Amino acid sequence: MSPDGNREGRIPLPSVDQALAMVLGRVVARSPRAHVLADALGLVLARDALADLDMPPFDKALVDGYAARSSDLEAGDRRLVLGELLPAGATPSRGLGDREAAVIMTGAPLPLGADVVVMHERTHRSGDFVVIDEPSIKPGQNILRRGREARAGDVVVERGRELTPARLGVLASFGCPRVMATPRPEVVVVPTGDELVEPDSAPGPGQIRNSGSTMLTALAVQAGARARALEIAPDRPEALRAALERGLDADLLIVTGGVSAGQRDLVPASLEALGVECVFHKVRIKPGKPIWFGVARPRGDRPGTLVFGLPGNPVGSLVGFLVFARPALWLLAGRPGNAFARSSARLEGPFSHRGDRPTYFPAVLTTTSTPPVARPLEWAGSADLRRAAEADGFLAFEAGDRDYAAGEIVPFLPMG
């Protein structure tokens, strides 16, 4: 073993891609279940949603105006007799009479015989007549035909689609009050360390506030999960194991701190004592090298909890989540495409990378071109969350000493 307790002296640490493949290979997506639309925002549809009727279910007016027969307007006389009033939601009581126009509102069904709607602004009244001032009349003008949006039985939202507000509106309009969708993964965050105090407490000598729980629960929610943080677990084996055991009820457990190789880094041994299988410990990455990943034993028909031990330093924890935990959450939530998506950016200026590990360096995007242009931030390292928080994401520089030129393309890890 190397002096820090890891076997990396004999066995090379996994690369980022190797470690990510190990993570994703252990993910079992949650089984779909029924959700009411009010609870389905952001979920992934598990079955195609079908139209239960034609949409629109009738020929309808697209504007306020007059429903008429276009053939009545082909001759020189542009006057039509005023017929019945048709507001939205009304049903015509009869078809159009000879040279008659019905007063119609947007969304109302057309009376039988009407094949055009003339905008109110292109007409004027003359006693019991309406005079059509529109010079060019074509059949179908200002009309949405029955079934133009969809026919009964058509797929209106495909499975695998994220349920956005607009798609939820589509489902509601086609009579789908409940949908089969992959439920949100449940995430628990357990912060560890005697040096931590909660944000509403004043740190004592040698203490810092717990920023990780707030950041990581927010990241998990942003990735589509339900997330909660437990209280800070102390650096005492029994208390730590009790906190970790509570977290194993979730789909994914995130533990911060205690994963390196110091005498007080008790998390790996505590997790393994609870039956969590270690898949890897430490990755060739900067920041975030001490990351630990394992899988708990299955409970009944429920897959084992995915467990990530992230470094205590905030930016290492942030990078570890974005690189490894977020793709796992996307897979759990039924978003396989997100998990494997890659981005890149063009360097705004020259950049020098030094080090034997790939480095994730915070950067802002300065253009919206394709690929976008990125400028690395002035950054003090893995404890400097303040400046990293201003980033749009992280530029992923390869291991080794290299001077990059302005304009070079570099992999980019988006923050959101």
Predicted regions span which residues?
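Short, low-complexity N-terminal leaders and the immediately following helix N-cap/first helix
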Residues: 1-75, 80, 336-360
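Short, glycine/charged-enriched hinge/interface segments at domain edges or termini
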Residues: 2-14, 22, 66-231, 374, ...
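Phosphate-binding chemistry for phosphorylated carbohydrates and sugar-nucleotides
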Residues: 153, 237, 348
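Helix-rich terminal scaffold detector
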Residues: 1-4, 8-16, 177-310, 314-320
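Predominant activation on well-ordered alpha-helical scaffold segments within soluble catalytic domains
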Residues: 20-24, 64, 120-121, 154-157, ...
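Flexible glycine/proline-rich
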Residues: 33-38, 47, 60, 89, ...
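Generic structural signal for well-ordered, non-membrane alpha-helical segments
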Residues: 12-20, 33, 37, 59, ...
